[in-house]
Amino acid sequence: MPFRLRKRPSEQITTATKNGEKLHQYAACVNQQCPGVSTAEDIFSFLDAVDGRTNAEFLAPCSAGPRLCHIADHLSVYNDFLQLLDMELKEDKPGEFGLFPLKVHYPVGADQRSCIKGWSLLHWLLREHCCVKTLILPWLIDSKYQRLLSDALHLNSGLKKLTLHNWQAKRAFKDIISAIGTLAQLEELDMELVYLPPSALGCLGTALQRISTLKTLKLPSVDMDVCNASHLSCITQFVKALKGCPKLAVLSSDNFLLVPASGEGFAEFVMESSSLTKLSLCHSPRYHSKECALFMAVGKNNNLEELCLDGFMLYEEAERLLAEVAAQHTGLRYLEVGFYDGFREWEINGTALANLVGRNTGLRELVFSGGTVSCIPEFAEAIPKNATMQKLTLGLLDMDVPNYRVFLQALARNQSLQLVTFKESSYYYFNDIVLLVRETGTEGRLAIDADVHDPQDFEKGLKNSTSLTRVAYSNREAAGLTPPGAFRHLLHHRCLHELRIGLPRPIEMESATSLALLLSTTSSLRCATFEFLATASSSRILVEGLAGNRSLTDLSVSFWTIEAPEADLLWRMLRSSRTLKTLTLELLDFPQSPMLDRVPEGLLQNHYLLRAAIQRNPTPSLDMYHDGIHRQVLKKLNVLSTPTFQFGVQELLRRNLSTLHRAVQFVTGSRGRRYAEAFERVSKGSTLVEALKKALAEPEDKIKGRIASSSRYLDEHFLVEAGVVRAAVVCGESGRVQLDRIGFDNWLCIRQYLKVTDIVLTPVGLLADPSSSGSLQD
């Protein structure tokens, strides 16, 4: 047996002593930042326990770089305590980690004795691990922990994205803003839901100028008095500070930037910026803004690609100016203006924007809301002239069938528009629209963003078409019952991509059977939402339909009755699903098990699911759902799942996300057992294709070719990637390679029954038999 060096007992004691001293020092530091919350000794005891659970790797420095940081192996330990803050640590991108809220509607810091554990870990992760790139904080932070957070940000060296929510603590926020200015690698700062006094803008402006890497900025709302000279001065100084952000490409804010005192300065910033490509402004009625100066500035900055004016109700002069600027702009690709509402005090005329469509500009997408049907003739005249625009969205009050007829006849003469979407609050002429689309030959090019409500109209529309791609039916307020045969017509829609159904009464057996048949036979349906009561027998049929589905990527189910056989079938369906990545199972009735306390085995075996909400305990708020049926179910189902179950679900999702990242890395060249095992688990599903398309920006056929090539590589180099050999198998003294191309076909026959997880590596300390004729060849 070969000789092995071992640490002397004194060396082990020295290491343990040093680690203990380091933990004591860190515990004292945390206690100093949060006086009165706990004691340094209690914090030390907790950290020492964490160190033990991570095999003494807690104190190890961040190992990010070519290899994965060691915190990837201990996510369960960290999340066991971060969940006390309603937060989680997960691998957001390959090799990059982030801290995210679990339930953003819950305040943080309610139980101080427990929360200090979570805050200690959060502080440590931000201070010591540059692989943590994202921090999205929950809604409210207890003031006792704000110093600790500020200290963590000051000491951080890796954050690229920071999001703050609903911060209202005015005194402590200056420390946080100061700390933000020290984040040397920050690329995205989101303060959209923060509410600040004007005086804090000076500190924020100074901090932003110190971050040379900042690319995306969402500004906070400001509690400003437009008659207060001091407030206006703060806004003006902040606008000047924006010029000190040389890489700022995306800017989002409400219109406090456009008040008369700072409007000219902001327009100057927009005009001169060489990096700004996307500008989003949200109108607030508290401020009187000057849009015209902004529009002129936009016209002089050809780098700008997207302009969003959310909630702006433009007068005729401003609308004409905006349309003229957009028409002459050589870089603008996306324009959004107005807002859609069932009631408005005045409307945007819309004529100038309609004429813009007919001028064949570089604009690829226009979203216009806030007008009436009076501008439909102008749009109908302009659309046939356009040869460049690809998407158009309109939110116009008082649309009816004759207006749609005029519009669709014009759309039929247009070749470039791929999709036109109309925003509606509700509509009762579904069948008429279906007939018009068929008559004008515009199938697949029109979408109406509203639910169908009338049962008879719903059935007629389904019957008179076979090319619908999206169906949303909500009969909660309708007096009549849905005709039992209505859903049967869905079987003829071979291009159906999205289906959403809500009913006021338990679904009838015939309807359930039709839906089940659709689910089990469709190859096109990707998203399905079912929100209706279902008896045990109806639920059984529906679950059987789901079990036969091979296309859904997004599934949401509410109010079904799931007995033991159906529950078993449901979990088995999830085990075998290779397409489903988003799952919502809420307020289901499990008569045999009123409370879920462990994650079912079938669900645990699913490696494709990335987002899930399963039997989460609802809040007692009566307005969580908007009809009596939902409140009845809420009362019936008091407790739906235990914290252990919910933690298990989150663990599964984190595991699957990391598995997907390892598989992506395998396809892009990373090698080793960890990567090969992950690739083998998810290579047959659609999630890997989508992840690679996002990572590599390549077409789907090329991505599938990459996956096929990686599969062939793994087949050929299985023994190496599984860790059996280093490079090849050598037999005897001749050095001849035993496994070569000669027996490759035979090897493939064996390989089809063999997975990476079937190979059990020799535990550390056990040596190979010296009499073995095989040896490792590098």
Where in this protein do the model-derived segments appear?
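Eukaryotic tandem repeat interaction scaffolds
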Residues: V337, N349-L353, C495-L585
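Extracellular leucine-rich repeat
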Residues: L99-I116, L125-S143, A152-K170, S178-P198, ...
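Cullin-RING E3 adaptor/co-adaptor recruitment helices
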Residues: P2-V132, W139-I141, D398, S426, ...
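Short amphipathic alpha-helical interaction elements and helix-loop-helix interfaces
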Residues: I141, Q168, L186, R210, ...
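Recurring C-terminal helix/loop segment of individual leucine-rich repeat
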Residues: W124-R127, L148-H154, D175-G181, C203-Q209, ...
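Leucine-rich repeat
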Residues: E91-L99, R127-T134, H154-K161, G181-E188, ...
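Short, solvent-exposed loop/turn at the beta-strand->alpha-helix junction
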Residues: A110-S120, L140-R147, W167-K174, Y195-G202, ...
